[in-house]
Structure formats: C-alpha cells, structure tokens
Amino acid sequence: MKNKFLLFTFVASICTTNMIAGNISDTIVPTKHNKQFTIGELAEIQPGLGSIMREFGHRFYIAYYAAKANNWDLAKYQINEILEAQEIVEVTRPKYAKQLKSFENSSIKKLQNSIEKKDWKLFKQKYNETTNACNACHTVNGHPYIKYQLPKKEPKYLRMSL
C-alpha cells in the first residue's frame, strides 16, 4: 500500500511539474520493470471502489476471527490495512473521502480501541456496529443490495490463533 502511495506521490509531482508543459495525461512515468506508462494509462487502471471494498470486507472478516482467537496483533494488522486501503480510495475516488473519514472516526477508531483493550466482548459489539455502519453506507450510496455478513467460519488458509 505504501508503495502505491509513493508511486501516486511521484506521479503527482510529475503532473505538477508538467502542468505548464501541456497535456498531463501524455506524461510518461517509468517503472522499475523497464516499462513506461502515461499518466492517462495509470489513471485508467486505478482500482474501482468495488475492488477496494472487497479487500475491506475480507480484512474485516479476518479481524473478527483473529480477535475471537485472542490474536490481537493480527486483528490490529487487518484493521490498519483497511485504513491503508481507505487512503487509496480517498485519493482515487475523492467524492467518497469525507464519508470514509467520517466512517473511520465514528466506527473504525472504536474498533481499534477495543483491539487495544484486548476486550472480546467490546470488540464484538463494535464489530457489529461497524457492520451496520457499512451496510447503511451502501444504502446511502445507492447500493442497498450490498449487505455485509460475517462468514460463519474463519478462513482456512490463515491460522487465527497464536
């Protein structure tokens, strides 16, 4: 995630430098793989909100079962990764930035607090509140048919307990 942010910062600085020169979307950005992209090409391949929300949901799911298994470090890691993904959305989909920041302040921070306290009962309560906030946000944004629900079993590919 941080590499994506650094790339975005690099691209933004090139854009600022080249604004005077002409069409920004034609500015070429080199990669570490000896490939070159134009700013326009990079803009076209940015993930949509649905792709990032899928990551949100998956990490949210892992956080629940990690906390349930008292693996508070894994739960904390997953929530922090959600926030990093949120930063990408705030940059690439700025119309959602205010709403996401509000969600972070009203829900995610309370969830993080329950993780810091290592309090399963509090975590479960805040997790359910956060789930309700997610589903309400989907409705407000015209997607009432998207309802997150916690899978009944923990992921088999990742050990939850320490």
Which sequence ranges carry the predicted segments?
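Sec-dependent N-terminal signal peptides
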Residues: 5-14
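Immediate post-signal-peptide N-terminus of mature secreted/exported proteins
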Residues: 22-72, 162
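Short helix-adjacent coil turns
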Residues: 67-71, 115-122
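Solenoid-repeat scaffolds in large eukaryotic assemblies
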Residues: 74-76, 82, 123
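Short, solvent-exposed, charged loop/turn and helix-capping segments
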Residues: 85-102
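The canonical Cys-X-X-Cys-His
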Residues: 130-141
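Short cysteine/histidine-rich metal-coordination sites, predominantly Zn2+-binding motifs
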Residues: 148-158
